[in-house]
Regions:
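Residue-level signature for short turns and capping positions that connect secondary-structure elements
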Residues: 39, 49, 115-117
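Short, solvent-exposed coil/turn elements at secondary-structure transition points
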Residues: 28, 50, 95-97
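Core segments of cupin and vicinal oxygen chelate
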Residues: 3-47
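Short, solvent-exposed beta-strand edge segments and adjacent coil->beta transition regions
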Residues: 59-63
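Short beta-strand/turn micro-motifs at beta-sheet edges
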Residues: 49-55
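Short glycine/proline-enriched turns and hinge-like loops at secondary-structure junctions
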Residues: 27, 56-58
Length: 135
């Protein structure tokens, strides 16, 4: 569950742009649950338009990540889709995965990724690497 300011605006991003199917909507609790195959894998909780931004150095969630496939072409298509919607995207090569990052309407960072290989099974330290990725 991540906190957002506005339920409808967040739904428009996560369902409308990222295409996460809605599993349940609870307007009375300002919550929406999204499915990735299970009943609910991800949820938003609206805390109000006046809620302050989380401080970047405070403890808490750094970002959420969603695996979108296995192929680099799937990541390229996701990048094109986000950019066509006016969303700024950063691409990164993590050796074990290839990723793009963007922010939701409330500044929460979202990672979309494809697995690059099984290198992490042989080199666990490879998981912490980051380099620019040209898509």
């Amino acid at each position: 569950v991540i906190k957002v300011r506005n339920q409808e605006r967040a739904e428009a991003f996560y369902n409308g742009i990222l295409k996460l199917p809605i599993a349940a909507r609870l307007p009375s609790k300002s919550m929406t649950f999204f499915t990735l195959g299970n009943h609910h894998d991800f949820a938003i909780l609206a805390v109000g338009d006046d809620a302050p931004d989380a401080h970047p150095d405070s403890p808490g969630l750094l970002h959420v990540a969603f695996k979108i496939g296995h192929l680099l072409d799937e990541l390229r298509e996701a990048k094109r889709h986000l950019e066509a919607a006016g969303i700024e995207v950063i691409a990164r090569d993590h050796v074990v995965s290839k990723s793009i990052y963007c922010n939701d309407p409330d500044g929460n960072t979202v990672e979309l990724y494809v697995d690059a290989s099984d290198v992490w099974k042989l080199q666990p330290e490879a998981v912490a690497q980051t380099a620019p990725l040209d898509l």
